[in-house]
């Protein structure tokens, strides 16, 4: 699910739901983000052929205080909910925990959801929308969007209506979460909320180095490494930090914040950000290529600045 600005970006053709009004029919920006989460979960149920009762747990989060977008957006479905806050890394956190839950045998089907909204994030973290502040080139544009994913122990789903059963192929039989490296808090003392790429890049570098060591990764193993929202500024810092560690990923690396907008045409400075940034790019760019076998192994590194 994406907003109007995201629709005009390079991935605009690939979203399932786009509203012509970034309020999504709501009465406030917070209400709009709740509706985005609800729409994303509804679309997940539609595409998988499931009912809410088929989902054992939901792991979900957003950027707002007390996770109000998540709690109000998902309350009507009556599904056990774990509310998560990992700033803009929430999509990775929810997928990681969902995969652990399924792999450990605690659930068969778990939903992982994350959302953000430009206007609600600006209102809470930065400046009033009518203030008209100047944005430095290192700043990023919070994505209005949400992604909902099913983590399941079965590549196909059996749906029964009375005595009649049918097989629903979710189309992602070849896409699995084969391993997880959990990031640590890495703080270089950056305090500029208009330069989150610089704040997050050291943590991303630390995680990628840890992943290479944990899984004994050699050059050529991954077809793509994609971070969440370092943007153009954070990208260069990340590549520099990794080269200092003896790791060169420049030929396979990109960032969700870079992919979601055209910075020259859309005036988005360093790129996109927010929980919704990695949430919508993961499906429209990464999973689509995995499903088509254009990519075989991807390291997905959503990043968050706990400023």
Locate each region found by the language model.
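Short, well-ordered, mixed-charge alpha-helical segments that flank or form enzyme active sites
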Residues: 67-68, 118-123, 159, 185-189, ...
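Condensing-enzyme catalytic core mediating Claisen C-C bond formation in acyl metabolism
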Residues: 1-30, 128-209, 214, 251-267, ...
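Short coil/turn connectors at secondary-structure junctions
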Residues: 52-56, 77-79, 104-110, 137, ...
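Membrane-interface helix-loop-helix junctions at boundaries between adjacent transmembrane segments
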Residues: 107, 121, 130-131
């Amino acid at each position: 699910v994406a907003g109007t600005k995201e629709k005009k970006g390079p991935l605009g053709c690939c979203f399932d739901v786009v509203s012509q009004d970034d309020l999504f029919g709501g009465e406030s920006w917070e209400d709009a983000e709740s509706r985005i989460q609800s729409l994303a979960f509804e679309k997940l149920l539609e595409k998988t052929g499931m009912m809410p009762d088929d989902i054992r747990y939901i792991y979900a989060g957003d950027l707002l205080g007390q996770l109000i977008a998540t709690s109000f957006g998902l309350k009507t479905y009556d599904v056990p909910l774990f509310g998560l806050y990992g700033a803009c890394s929430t999509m990775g956190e929810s997928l990681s925990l969902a995969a652990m839950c399924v792999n450990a045998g605690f659930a068969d089907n778990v939903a992982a959801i994350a959302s953000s909204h430009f206007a609600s994030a600006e209102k809470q973290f930065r400046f009033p929308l009518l203030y008209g502040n100047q944005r430095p080139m290192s700043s990023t544009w919070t994505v209005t969007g949400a992604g909902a994913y099913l983590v399941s122990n079965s590549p196909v789903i059996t749906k029964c209506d009375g005595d009649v059963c049918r097989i629903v192929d979710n189309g992602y039989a070849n896409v699995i979460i084969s391993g997880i490296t959990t990031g640590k808090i890495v703080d270089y003392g950056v305090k500029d909320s208009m330069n989150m790429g610089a704040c997050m890049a050291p943590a991303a570098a630390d995680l990628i180095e840890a992943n290479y060591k944990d899984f004994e990764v050699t050059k050529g193993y991954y077809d793509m490494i994609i971070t969440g929202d370092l943007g153009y500024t954070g990208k260069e810092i990340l590549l520099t930090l990794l080269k200092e560690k003896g790791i060169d990923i420049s030929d396979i690396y990109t960032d969700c914040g870079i992919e979601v907008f055209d910075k020259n045409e859309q005036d988005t400075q360093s790129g996109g950000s927010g929980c919704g940034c990695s949430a919508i790019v993961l499906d429209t760019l990464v999973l689509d290529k995995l499903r088509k076998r254009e990519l075989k192994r991807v390291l997905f590194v959503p990043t968050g600045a706990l400023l």
